[in-house]
């Protein structure tokens, strides 16, 4: 029927907009309502038939509205703007024509119902998100403007309904404006996104509890709009922004905490920069106040925590230690690595830093020292008793608080205060997995091998990593439910071996996460919206149908129940009519023949054709359930999980859901189950969207529940009516289930393969590097090393020239650096093995599920069997790779690493003994060092006496190995011959510069071997009292003035100037002369005072020529 044939006038002021998008939910509703507009029944019709047009119109209106409310597709802003005015025009016209409560309620509450169906997708960038929200706000203003209120008033309808234009405009616009204000305030606190925050960030930011910024946006005042995509998407975006502020503010409290030691505060600052202020594109963004605070903190750190550069070059470095050492040495939190060739101090990372008598770290935040903790966890060596006591006290207290708290903010603050930041938790997990992979379980029973300290670190790090991962998206919105389910489900599989070793397997970690970070259930919001909808229906029913129930009431409540069930996992609270209560009691309202006649009229897709009195008869309910639900069940089970078959199944399910609405009661929640099934199957109509295993399980459960309802209805009709019972939805008999499970299983396999591919590549790269390093080291240690007493030479073969020389410390540093490269490759191998083991564990569990599903299918060659074979083949490949790669980590030593480890162990023992002997004041340390030398020499002689299978390497390979290991070490050049030295004389005729060579002024200084440049020698030199420039000038001036009457040499001749030790007193220098020569004679010096002759005292001696002057090294 065209619009020109309608006799109902359109309201004034309605102008049709541009053509709306085709096939949208609002466009479909508009088309359905357009076909409903017809003139009222003529008064000449017989009595009793005048109600039929109104009934048919109400049924069609109800069907169209139900399709709109229960549709899985969303309404875009463009569709809403294009269809709004024509749709409102049609509703007002229908209401003037029929005066139905359905038309009144739908027209009055259409703005709110449309807002609940509006599509919203906010981009990740704030500017784009604000622009998108402005579009939504303009759309809300357009559908709730004056044209809408005038149209409703002209039709005699309310504008102040709960979901009407006035309330929706006020509530939605106020919510959007408040959301924008809160979001902008959170963005202003982020130095990464705000230039103002970068320059004006205060170190005194108050902590922001998790979820607090969005608390005012989820108050009961917004309950009517809470399920809408506008609110849900806005809360999701706000959660991403505000949760960063929460984590950042919790960490910020520690960087200037006066109760912490300076080193602890500096380490918290570095962790803050790494976790929250470093971006891939801009690097570290450090606000000026934070930089100034860090510089002030570093100046207060005890220098004893740093190892001098000359000693640091002999030690193996790690990436974490280099990060801390570089930042502390360069006094900048931006510094992460030292430039090549830089000589820099090194921070101590030994277990002794945790000792109670060492005041470097605060006892309440020992876990903040990342390089020291990583080394402690990787090596597994127990620290001292005092350090163990401090660590256990902190770890036990932290783990107890994490276990016994159900507040996310309390747990986050507890983890952060103890030093378990997001990056630290990840690093500690990697360190412990490396320790487990290194062969510890091979020597100990399964599940053991970790010390108590390691177990506590593992428990806290595992819980902390998952808590911080959830905290980034935590919020009161439906999307967080999926995030929580995903992270919770993968928490014990991702690090399965470590979870088992620390006792968090078997659901312990999942339960801990559920207690702390479980999503909040919006029970009150949904209950408030339900009460509001019921109230609106009751109002419309009293006004237009004398209190009779509206056909749309159940539809609206089903829509709300389906939303709660599919988005929040909430079971509907409305009690459904049990099937047993529908058994006929007393005389039936209609004869069985009437029921049979009406049942024969049930045809898909017709919703009318049966008289309302028959539909409302309880005796007719089993017929509808057996036929309608049974047909829907058969159509769905026989549809393959492909777009076209699922589209047809969805139409049958929608017909079964809407059949008899308003007259036929909902039995065992069958309409809610049908609606949930439609929502779950709707993504299958879009190409490229595959099912998940969880979705397949939910759909199978709903099909089984519908089968119970249909089977019960068939049993009620017997023996009067014999209907074939529906086939139970089994995997072996349902095309939908077998195809859906097969696609879901293959989707899981694809995800596992995508995870395994980079891990295998990383594993391959690490193994190649390890092989190269091992071969190089094996060839390196096949060489013979000779010494001339001060330097080392490498001899690759008897007939080859010696390579070198190098100083011993230079060679030790080169080997240590090469070992560092080896350890980097080893860490990459450990991380890859841990990730690959997680893939193997998940694949094994997935294969078990597929085996159970495939066992339900009798015929061979089915699609599930094919997928199962693919999974089995993938598991065999990944398991084989993991098993072969794990052999490199088995045993006490990695193959090819034995000689290098022996060399490093001996080098460390000799170096420690040598340093102790030099710093000792008694003979005990010297004797211990001599004994260590003796033991080392005996060990070398014993090894040389054994016949050991040597790695067959050529002289060229050994030469290449020496060049590779010693590539960055500078050869120690021999001393320059005397001909290359420039001779300095004592000639000082300032008027004859042409007779002298100015070459010495441009020559570099050569430090003679007699000068001690060791840390002890430099410390002794720097501790002396030095002559000031003015004192030196006074002495030299006195010498020049006394040169005219030089005294003869004798007992009173002036002696050398002396440099006194620290703590001595230097006498005020005076002009030397005959009257005070006794005061400066050598015999008057205090005993034990060491003197230093001054070689440059000018003395006039014309008889001495430059050629006769002895050479002096500048």
Curated annotation (Swiss-Prot):
Keywords assigned by UniProt, alphabetized: Host cytoplasm, Host Golgi apparatus, Host nucleus, Virion, Virion tegument
Subcellular location: Virion tegument; Host cytoplasm; Host nucleus; Host Golgi apparatus, Host trans-Golgi network
NAD recorded as keyword: no
Motif Nuclear export signal: positions: 263-272
Subunit structure: Interacts (via C-terminus) with the large tegument protein/LTP (via N-terminus).
Similarity section: Belongs to the herpesviridae inner tegument protein family.
Known function: Plays an essential role in cytoplasmic secondary envelopment during viral egress. Interacts with the capsid via the large tegument protein/LTP and participates in its transport to the host trans-Golgi network (TGN) where secondary envelopment occurs. Modulates tegumentation and capsid accumulation at the viral assembly complex.
Protein name as annotated: Inner tegument protein
Native source species: Human herpesvirus 2 (strain HG52) (HHV-2)
């Amino acid at each position: 029927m065209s619009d020109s044939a309608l006799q109902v006038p359109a309201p004034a002021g309605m102008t049709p907009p541009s053509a709306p998008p085709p096939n949208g939910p609002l466009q479909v509703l508009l088309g359905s309502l357009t076909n409903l507009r017809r003139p009222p029944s003529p008064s000449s019709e017989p009595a009793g038939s005048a109600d039929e047009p109104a009934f048919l119109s109400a049924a069609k209106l109800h069907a169209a509205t139900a399709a709109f409310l229960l549709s899985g597709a969303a309404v875009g802003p463009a569709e809403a703007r294009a269809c709004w005015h024509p749709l409102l025009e049609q509703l007002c016209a229908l209401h003037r024509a029929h005066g139905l409560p359905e038309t009144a309620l739908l027209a009055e509450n259409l703005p709110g119902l449309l807002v609940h169906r509006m599509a919203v997708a906010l981009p990740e960038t704030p500017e784009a998100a604000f622009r998108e929200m402005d579009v939504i706000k303009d759309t809300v203003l357009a559908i709730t403007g004056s044209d809408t209120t005038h149209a409703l008033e002209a039709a005699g309808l309310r504008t102040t309904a709960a979901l009407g234009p006035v309330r929706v405009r006020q509530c939605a616009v106020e919510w959007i404006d408040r959301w924008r204000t809160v979001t902008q305030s959170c963005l202003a606190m982020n130095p990464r996104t705000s230039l103002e925050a970068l320059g004006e960030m205060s170190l005194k930011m108050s902590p922001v509890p998790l979820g607090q910024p969005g608390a005012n946006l989820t108050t009961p005042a917004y309950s009517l709009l809470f399920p809408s995509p506008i609110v849900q998407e806005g809360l999701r975006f706000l959660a991403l922004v505000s949760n960063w502020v929460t984590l950042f503010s919790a960490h910020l409290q520690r960087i200037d905490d006066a109760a912490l030691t300076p080193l602890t505060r500096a380490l918290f600052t570095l962790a803050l920069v790494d976790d929250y202020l470093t971006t891939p594109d801009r690097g570290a963004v450090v606000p000026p106040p934070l930089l100034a605070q860090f510089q002030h903190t570093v100046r207060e750190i005890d220098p004893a925590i740093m190892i001098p550069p000359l000693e640091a070059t002999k030690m193996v470095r790690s990436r974490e230690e280099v990060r801390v050492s570089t930042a502390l040495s360069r006094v900048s939190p931006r510094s992460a690595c030292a430039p090549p060739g830089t000589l820099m101090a090194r921070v101590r990372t030994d277990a002794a830093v945790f000792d109670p008598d060492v005041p470097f770290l605060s006892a309440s935040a020992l876990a903040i020292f990342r390089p020291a903790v990583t080394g402690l966890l990787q090596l597994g060596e127990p620290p001292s008793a005092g350090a163990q006591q401090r660590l256990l006290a902190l770890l036990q207290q932290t783990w107890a608080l994490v276990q016994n708290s159900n507040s996310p903010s309390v747990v986050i603050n507890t983890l952060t205060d103890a030093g378990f930041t997001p990056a630290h938790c990840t690093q500690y997990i990697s360190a412990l997995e490396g320790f487990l992979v290194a062969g510890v379980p091979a020597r100990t029973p399964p599940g053991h091998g970790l010390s108590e300290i390691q177990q506590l670190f593992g428990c806290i790090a595992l819980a902390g990593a998952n808590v911080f991962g959830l905290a980034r998206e935590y919020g009161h919105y439906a999307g967080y439910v999926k995030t929580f389910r995903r992270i919770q489900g993968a928490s014990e599989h991702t690090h399965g071996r470590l979870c088992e070793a620390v006792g968090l397997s078997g659901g312990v970690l999942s339960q801990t996460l559920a207690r702390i970070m479980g999503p909040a259930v919006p029970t009150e919001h949904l209950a408030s919206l339900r009460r509001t909808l019921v109230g609106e229906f009751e109002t419309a029913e009293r006004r237009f149908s004398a209190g009779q129930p509206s056909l749309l009431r159940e539809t609206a409540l089903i829509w709300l129940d389906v939303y709660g069930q599919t988005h929040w996992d909430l079971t509907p609270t409305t009690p459904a009519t049990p099937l047993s209560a529908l058994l006929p009691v007393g005389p039936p309202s209609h004869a069985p023949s009437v029921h049979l006649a009406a049942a024969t009229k049930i045809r898909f897709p017709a919703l009318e054709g049966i008289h309302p009195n028959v539909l409302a008869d309880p005796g007719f309910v089993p017929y509808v359930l057996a036929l309608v639900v049974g047909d829907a069940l058969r159509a769905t089970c026989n549809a393959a999980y492909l777009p076209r078959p699922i589209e047809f199944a969805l139409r049958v399910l929608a017909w079964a859901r809407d059949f008899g609405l308003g007259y036929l009661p909902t039995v065992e929640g069958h309409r809610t189950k049908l609606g949930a099934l439609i929502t779950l199957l709707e993504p299958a109509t879009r190409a490229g969207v595959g099912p998940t295993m969880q979705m397949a399980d939910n759909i199978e459960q709903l099909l089984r529940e519908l089968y119970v309802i249909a089977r019960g209805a068939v049993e009620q009709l017997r023996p009067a009516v014999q209907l074939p019972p529906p086939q139970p939805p089994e995997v072996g008999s349902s095309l939908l289930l077998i195809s859906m499970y097969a696609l879901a299983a293959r989707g899981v396999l694809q995800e596992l393969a995508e995870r395994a591919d980079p891990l295998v590549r990383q594993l391959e790269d690490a193994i190649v590097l390890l092989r190269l390093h091992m071969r190089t080291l094996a060839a390196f240690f096949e060489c013979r090393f000779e010494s001339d007493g001060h330097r080392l030479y490498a001899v690759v073969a008897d007939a080859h020239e010696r390579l070198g020389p190098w100083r011993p410390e230079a060679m030790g540093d080169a080997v240590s650096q090469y070992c560092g490269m080896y350890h980097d490759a080893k860490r990459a191998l450990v991380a890859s093995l841990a990730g690959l083991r997680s893939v193997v564990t998940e694949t094994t569990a997935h294969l078990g599920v597929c085996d159970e599903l495939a066992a339900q299918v009798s015929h061979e060659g089915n699609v599930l069997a094919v997928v199962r074979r693919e999974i089995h083949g993938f598991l065999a490949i990944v398991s084989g790779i993991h098993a072969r790669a794990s052999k490199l980590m088995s045993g006490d030593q990695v193959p090819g690493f034995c000689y290098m480890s022996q060399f490093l162990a001996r080098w460390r023992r000799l170096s420690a003994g040598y340093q102790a002997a030099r710093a000792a004041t008694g003979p005990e340390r010297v004797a211990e060092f001599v004994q260590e030398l003796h033991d080392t020499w005996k060990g070398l002689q014993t090894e040389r006496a054994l016949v050991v299978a040597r790695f067959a390497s050529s002289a060229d390979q050994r030469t290449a190995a020496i060049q590779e290991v010693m590539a960055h070490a500078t050869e120690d050049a021999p001393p320059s011959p005397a001909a290359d030295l420039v001779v300095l004389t004592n000639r000082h005729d300032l008027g004859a510069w042409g007779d002298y060579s100015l070459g010495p002024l441009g020559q570099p200084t050569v430090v003679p071997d007699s000068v001690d440049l060791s840390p002890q020698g430099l410390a002794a030199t720097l501790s002396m009292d030095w002559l000031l420039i003015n004192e030196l000038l006074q002495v030299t001036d006195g010498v020049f003035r006394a040169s005219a009457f030089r005294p003869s040499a004798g007992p009173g001749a002036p002696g050398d100037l002396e440099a006194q030790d620290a703590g001595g007193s230097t006498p005020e220098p005076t002009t030397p002369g005959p009257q005070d020569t006794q005061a400066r004679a050598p015999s008057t010096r205090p005993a034990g005072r060491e003197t230093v002759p001054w070689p440059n005292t000018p003395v006039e001696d014309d008889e001495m020529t430059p050629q006769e002057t002895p050479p002096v090294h500048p």
